[in-house]
């Protein structure tokens, strides 16, 4: 992405915004004084927008089904209890410095039959308004960069305990919307991706609990094309991700219930590779000397597969990329909800660490959820003290045990 030098100050603001979300889709592995930074395009695709998940450190691949299951694990939609549902999720961003950057997400689903469920989602991330000026202060116009994704979900319940699901999406990233011709234009980037997921839920009999179950889920998301912003530029990988988790749910008595979840995430994107010549000069590995780093020449699928074993530090480096989420939820009469979680990202995956808290209220068909993020490291982050709000509804018959 190249801009006129005259607008460098404004571009630095945009760069800061992009880097703040890029931190969600990058990791840093240090070796021999080098930083092996993994970056992707459209990192907003990994942001969990719903307040229920956010209140539990963004667990979601194995929690009970809800309106936002399409993001976390589309296979869960087949296990949702009501016939129809929809929700809106709102997440303000960088509130410490501006009030016009936010991520909004809308979800909806409908049961086609007791075993088949379809859904749709829309995600819109606005990067605010940027006023471009030249070196003399002359007005060059206003840009309102944004990113957008339109998604469809489908889930099929194979048996009482097992379901599978898939999602498909169109992604648009417009980082120069409205910029004047005095700035080198950045064409909109587009990409297509799919998710494949599975969800297993088994009832258990444990101690004095009235009811209990164990859920296990897996979702490989954003498998798809690279995204490119110019004809001459190199396309970027989108944030392909693998999530694997388990959730235990327990009903203590007719009024009290709880859940506890553990989830692991790994970004399935190649790690940059470096070489050092006889003079000690360090550069990206470029075996065919075409000025394009070898890892960038990998296709999406090849890059995804090699990401399991391409770290310079071997298996230790691969394990250092894994993000851990721990979350819990307590419910009273399935009406009042209290949530908490712990998010741990190793230095090799970005270094974010925070605790979360959340509240929920369900009244008739409506549900309102709120979450709050509190960092626990000295390093300041644009995510500090972030909140998310969700409102949704579910209607129709209870299809909890209606299958086949």
Q: Where do the model's predicted regions map?
A:
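Subset of outer-membrane beta-barrel
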Residues: 26-404
């Amino acid at each position: 992405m190249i801009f006129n030098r005259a607008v460098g100050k404004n571009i630095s603001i945009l760069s800061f915004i992009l880097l703040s979300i890029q931190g969600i889709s990058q990791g840093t592995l240090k070796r021999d004084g080098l930083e092996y930074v993994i970056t992707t395009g459209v990192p907003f695709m990994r942001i969990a927008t719903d307040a229920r998940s956010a209140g539990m450190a963004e667990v979601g691949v194995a929690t009970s089904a809800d309106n936002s299951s399409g993001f976390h694990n589309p296979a869960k939609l087949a296990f949702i209890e009501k016939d129809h549902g929809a929700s809106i999720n709102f997440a303000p961003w960088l509130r410490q410095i501006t009030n016009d950057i936010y991520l909004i997400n809308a979800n909806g689903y409908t049961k086609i039959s007791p075993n088949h469920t379809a859904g749709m989602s829309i995600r819109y991330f606005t990067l605010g308004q940027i006023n471009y000026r030249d070196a003399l202060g002359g007005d060059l116009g206003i840009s309102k960069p944004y990113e957008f994704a339109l998604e469809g979900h489908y889930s099929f319940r194979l048996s009482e305990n097992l379901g599978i699901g898939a999602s498909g999406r169109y992604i648009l990233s417009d980082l120069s919307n409205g910029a004047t011709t005095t700035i080198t234009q950045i064409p909109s980037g587009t990409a297509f991706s799919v998710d494949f997921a599975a969800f297993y839920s088994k009832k258990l009999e444990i101690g004095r609990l009235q009811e209990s179950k164990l859920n296990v889920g897996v979702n490989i998301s954003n498998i798809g094309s690279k995204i490119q912003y110019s004809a001459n530029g190199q396309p970027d990988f989108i944030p392909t991700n693998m999530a694997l988790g388990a959730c235990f749910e327990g009903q203590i008595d007719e009024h009290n219930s709880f859940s506890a979840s553990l989830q692991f995430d790994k970004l399935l994107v190649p790690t940059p590779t470096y070489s050092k010549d006889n003079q000690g000069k360090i550069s990206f590995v470029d075996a065919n000397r075409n000025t394009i780093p070898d890892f960038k020449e990998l296709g999406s699928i090849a890059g995804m597969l090699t990401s399991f074993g391409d770290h310079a530090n071997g298996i230790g480096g691969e394990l250092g990329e894994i993000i851990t989420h721990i979350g819990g939820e307590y419910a009273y009469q399935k009406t009042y909800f209290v949530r908490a979680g712990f998010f741990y990202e190793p230095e090799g995956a970005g270094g974010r660490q925070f605790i979360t808290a959340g509240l929920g209220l369900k009244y008739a068909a409506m549900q309102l959820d709120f979450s709050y993020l509190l960092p626990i490291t000295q390093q300041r982050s644009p995510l500090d003290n972030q909140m998310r709000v969700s409102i949704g509804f579910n209607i129709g018959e209870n299809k909890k045990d209606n299958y086949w």
